[in-house]
Amino acid sequence: MKKRIAYISLYFFTVLLIFILQKPLFMLYNGSIEKGFGFADYMQVMIHGASLDAATAGYLTAFPFLLVLISIWFRKFPLKKILYGYYILAAALISIIFVVDMALYTFWGFKLDASVFLYIDSPKEALASVSVGFILLRVLAILLLIALNSWVLLKITPSVLTATRKRIAGTAGMLLLGGVLFIIIRGGVTESTSNIGQVYFSNEPFLNHSAVNPDFSLLSSMGKSQDFASEFNFFDEEKRAALFDGLYPTTDGDSIIQVLNTKRPNILIILMEGFGGAFVEPLGGLPDVTPHFNRLSKEGIFFTNCYANSFRTDRGTVCTFSGYLGLPTASVMKIPAKSRTLPAIAEGLSKAGYKTDFLYGGDINFTNMKSYLLSTGYQRLIANTDFSLAEQTSNAWGV
């Protein structure tokens, strides 16, 4: 039994180490020294990226784990022979994705995702901007990495697993180990699951991108590849233009109304969920539920015809801070390659010299929120982990 647990543990940590070692290579290839990043930055990238590396290593450990679990009920189980093909496939995927991601980042500026498949139909055009030597060197690197990774994985794998006398107890023990593996893959036991945003830690996009596991980035984006342009196209362009005409301020003359008594105010944005008009008396809602808000409605600008943009936190947040309408079947916040390109209030304020903080009482890794906030101008994030344990557990959804 110890031999089985030792093998699964060794396999998992070997794959994890492969992913961790990829990070400094990725950074060096993409000019980290020229960009002024030092040893501390390399360490930060590897430490913060380890959780997503562990989740991806967990996925790749799932199949060997199932074989080891089954082997308990066999007198002799030829583990290495069965896993030979799987190791070649796993090594090929790890190596190809790493080299392609490393090479394309120089041109794209973002991590490998499902958009790479858009170029498969026209490889000639995709390869037109690089030389034959460029391609051959990277193909050679892929082949060497496949051979090296396969050799390492085969080296740590026992050839045969023999039967254990206590099969029931052994099965129970392995199932417990499987539970640990599931938690690693999921990314913990909190509301958020493993996502790209959990490894973001810096205001430097390059460091955040370096921390992202390319295998996870590619696989997670494949389920989000949709042709949104062909969906929900209810109006022709002429009618759409007529409906939108007048919604935006004109560019002629001075259309700005001065409503503040200072040109550089402190700005506090409070975003509340479930705060519907049914609870606000000035909107025809119940009386005395929001007395202080009722008072504020008389002192400032009160919008009486304002509707929530979506029914989920991630979609409504992006709409509020970036002015990007929520999509019916997808969350832009969960697509970092898109969300990082959106305009945002915090980004504009940062450029104007403001310090931008974001306070959130819940798990800020939920639905990739962390990556969106750091990518759109927020300089400091305060979340549930900044509070005491008692405060963190005071409510299921945060402080």
Segments (PLM) and residue ranges:
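Soluble catalytic regions of membrane-associated enzymes that act on cell-envelope
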Residues: T190-V399
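Transmembrane and membrane-interface helices of multi-pass
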Residues: K2-D227
